[in-house]
Protein backbone atom coordinates (compact mmCIF):
# COMPACT_ATOMS: atom_id res chain seq x y z
CA UNK A 1 0.00 0.00 0.00
CA UNK A 2 1.31 3.41 -0.95
CA UNK A 3 0.37 5.41 2.16
CA UNK A 4 0.88 9.14 2.65
CA UNK A 5 1.10 10.68 6.12
CA UNK A 6 0.29 14.38 6.37
CA UNK A 7 1.59 16.13 9.48
CA UNK A 8 -0.84 19.00 9.91
CA UNK A 9 1.05 21.06 12.46
CA UNK A 10 3.15 24.08 11.56
CA UNK A 11 5.28 23.46 14.69
CA UNK A 12 8.75 22.05 14.09
CA UNK A 13 8.98 20.40 17.51
CA UNK A 14 5.35 19.56 18.26
CA UNK A 15 3.79 16.31 19.44
CA UNK A 16 1.83 15.98 16.19
CA UNK A 17 5.08 15.99 14.24
CA UNK A 18 6.48 13.29 16.53
CA UNK A 19 3.42 11.08 15.93
CA UNK A 20 3.45 11.68 12.16
CA UNK A 21 7.17 10.94 11.91
CA UNK A 22 6.72 7.75 13.95
CA UNK A 23 3.98 6.45 11.63
CA UNK A 24 5.85 7.40 8.46
CA UNK A 25 9.08 5.75 9.66
CA UNK A 26 7.40 2.60 10.98
CA UNK A 27 5.49 1.98 7.75
CA UNK A 28 8.13 3.40 5.35
CA UNK A 29 5.67 5.84 3.84
CA UNK A 30 5.75 9.24 2.23
CA UNK A 31 5.41 12.15 4.68
CA UNK A 32 4.26 15.67 4.01
CA UNK A 33 5.35 17.71 7.01
CA UNK A 34 3.57 21.06 7.00
CA UNK A 35 6.18 22.51 9.37
CA UNK A 36 8.61 22.26 6.43
CA UNK A 37 6.38 21.95 3.36
CA UNK A 38 5.31 25.58 3.29
CA UNK A 39 2.36 26.56 1.13
CA UNK A 40 1.00 30.04 0.41
CA UNK A 41 -2.30 31.04 1.97
CA UNK A 42 -5.04 29.64 -0.26
CA UNK A 43 -6.92 32.41 -2.04
CA UNK A 44 -8.95 30.48 -4.59
CA UNK A 45 -7.23 32.10 -7.56
CA UNK A 46 -6.46 29.75 -10.47
CA UNK A 47 -2.82 30.83 -10.77
CA UNK A 48 -2.04 29.24 -7.39
CA UNK A 49 -2.52 25.84 -9.06
CA UNK A 50 0.58 26.58 -11.13
CA UNK A 51 2.85 26.92 -8.07
CA UNK A 52 5.36 24.07 -7.79
CA UNK A 53 4.56 23.32 -4.13
CA UNK A 54 0.84 23.13 -4.90
CA UNK A 55 1.48 20.84 -7.88
CA UNK A 56 3.70 18.63 -5.73
CA UNK A 57 1.05 18.43 -3.00
CA UNK A 58 -1.60 17.40 -5.52
CA UNK A 59 0.69 14.80 -7.12
CA UNK A 60 1.68 13.20 -3.83
CA UNK A 61 -1.92 12.97 -2.59
CA UNK A 62 -3.10 11.61 -5.96
CA UNK A 63 -0.34 8.98 -5.98
CA UNK A 64 -1.23 7.64 -2.51
CA UNK A 65 -3.54 4.65 -2.07
CA UNK A 66 -4.43 5.85 1.43
CA UNK A 67 -3.86 8.91 3.62
CA UNK A 68 -3.27 9.44 7.34
CA UNK A 69 -4.14 12.99 8.41
CA UNK A 70 -2.78 14.23 11.73
CA UNK A 71 -3.59 17.55 13.34
CA UNK A 72 -3.31 19.22 16.70
CA UNK A 73 -6.57 20.64 17.99
CA UNK A 74 -6.49 24.43 17.84
CA UNK A 75 -9.57 26.28 19.10
CA UNK A 76 -11.83 23.23 18.66
CA UNK A 77 -10.71 22.47 15.11
CA UNK A 78 -7.87 21.23 12.94
CA UNK A 79 -4.80 23.42 12.50
CA UNK A 80 -4.97 26.30 10.06
CA UNK A 81 -1.93 24.85 8.27
CA UNK A 82 -3.76 21.60 7.55
CA UNK A 83 -6.97 23.32 6.50
CA UNK A 84 -4.97 25.58 4.19
CA UNK A 85 -3.25 22.57 2.58
CA UNK A 86 -6.56 20.75 2.16
CA UNK A 87 -8.09 23.81 0.51
CA UNK A 88 -5.65 23.33 -2.40
CA UNK A 89 -7.03 19.81 -2.93
CA UNK A 90 -10.34 18.48 -4.19
CA UNK A 91 -12.27 15.33 -4.99
CA UNK A 92 -9.89 14.97 -7.93
CA UNK A 93 -7.25 13.86 -5.40
CA UNK A 94 -9.45 12.33 -2.68
CA UNK A 95 -12.54 10.76 -4.29
CA UNK A 96 -13.10 7.32 -2.68
CA UNK A 97 -9.60 7.34 -1.18
CA UNK A 98 -9.42 5.83 2.33
CA UNK A 99 -8.35 8.35 4.96
CA UNK A 100 -7.48 7.79 8.64
CA UNK A 101 -7.77 10.64 11.13
CA UNK A 102 -5.60 11.25 14.17
CA UNK A 103 -5.78 14.28 16.46
CA UNK A 104 -3.19 15.30 19.00
CA UNK A 105 -4.75 16.99 22.00
CA UNK A 106 -3.27 19.30 24.56
CA UNK A 107 -5.26 17.85 27.43
CA UNK A 108 -7.54 15.05 28.53
CA UNK A 109 -10.67 16.27 26.75
CA UNK A 110 -9.41 17.65 23.45
CA UNK A 111 -9.11 16.20 19.99
CA UNK A 112 -12.64 15.14 19.10
CA UNK A 113 -13.51 18.50 17.56
CA UNK A 114 -10.42 18.39 15.34
CA UNK A 115 -11.42 14.87 14.25
CA UNK A 116 -14.94 16.01 13.44
CA UNK A 117 -13.59 19.04 11.58
CA UNK A 118 -11.26 16.87 9.48
CA UNK A 119 -14.07 14.37 8.84
CA UNK A 120 -16.37 17.14 7.58
CA UNK A 121 -13.73 18.47 5.17
CA UNK A 122 -12.93 14.97 3.92
CA UNK A 123 -16.62 14.33 3.30
CA UNK A 124 -16.62 17.48 1.16
CA UNK A 125 -13.96 15.98 -1.15
CA UNK A 126 -15.63 12.53 -1.23
CA UNK A 127 -12.88 10.73 0.69
CA UNK A 128 -13.72 7.50 2.52
CA UNK A 129 -12.83 8.25 6.12
CA UNK A 130 -12.38 4.97 7.96
CA UNK A 131 -14.40 4.33 11.15
CA UNK A 132 -11.41 4.00 13.50
CA UNK A 133 -9.90 7.29 14.63
CA UNK A 134 -7.48 8.25 17.39
CA UNK A 135 -6.87 11.07 19.82
CA UNK A 136 -3.38 11.22 21.29
CA UNK A 137 -3.11 12.97 24.63
CA UNK A 138 0.19 14.26 26.06
CA UNK A 139 0.73 10.93 27.88
CA UNK A 140 0.87 9.18 24.49
CA UNK A 141 3.87 11.15 23.24
CA UNK A 142 7.41 10.63 24.53
CA UNK A 143 8.74 14.11 23.77
CA UNK A 144 12.15 13.44 25.32
CA UNK A 145 12.83 10.55 22.92
CA UNK A 146 10.78 12.03 20.03
CA UNK A 147 8.53 8.99 19.66
CA UNK A 148 5.12 7.75 20.70
CA UNK A 149 4.67 6.09 24.07
CA UNK A 150 4.38 2.32 24.32
CA UNK A 151 0.78 2.63 25.56
CA UNK A 152 -0.48 3.87 22.16
CA UNK A 153 1.57 1.87 19.65
CA UNK A 154 -1.00 -0.95 19.39
CA UNK A 155 -3.80 1.53 18.70
CA UNK A 156 -1.75 3.15 15.93
CA UNK A 157 -1.05 -0.29 14.46
CA UNK A 158 -4.78 -1.10 14.48
CA UNK A 159 -5.57 2.24 12.81
CA UNK A 160 -3.10 1.58 9.99
CA UNK A 161 -4.32 -2.03 9.61
CA UNK A 162 -7.90 -0.78 9.18
CA UNK A 163 -6.73 1.84 6.69
CA UNK A 164 -4.89 -0.88 4.76
CA UNK A 165 -8.00 -3.08 4.75
CA UNK A 166 -10.06 -0.25 3.24
CA UNK A 167 -7.33 0.50 0.68
CA UNK A 168 -7.26 -3.15 -0.41
CA UNK A 169 -11.07 -3.35 -0.57
CA UNK A 170 -11.21 -0.28 -2.80
CA UNK A 171 -8.29 -1.38 -4.94
CA UNK A 172 -7.60 -5.14 -4.81
CA UNK A 173 -4.26 -4.60 -6.56
CA UNK A 174 -2.86 -2.71 -3.54
Swiss-Prot record:
MF annotations from Gene Ontology: FMN binding; identical protein binding; oxidoreductase activity
Cofactor: FMN
GO CC field: cytosol
Induction and repression of expression: Part of the yhcYZ-yhdA operon that is induced by the two-component regulatory system LiaS/LiaR in response to cell envelope stress.
Presence of the UniProt keyword NADP in the record: yes
Superkingdom of this protein's organism: Bacteria
Subunit structure: Homotetramer.
The protein's name: FMN-dependent NADPH-azoreductase
Organism of derivation: Bacillus subtilis (strain 168)
Gene for this chain: azr
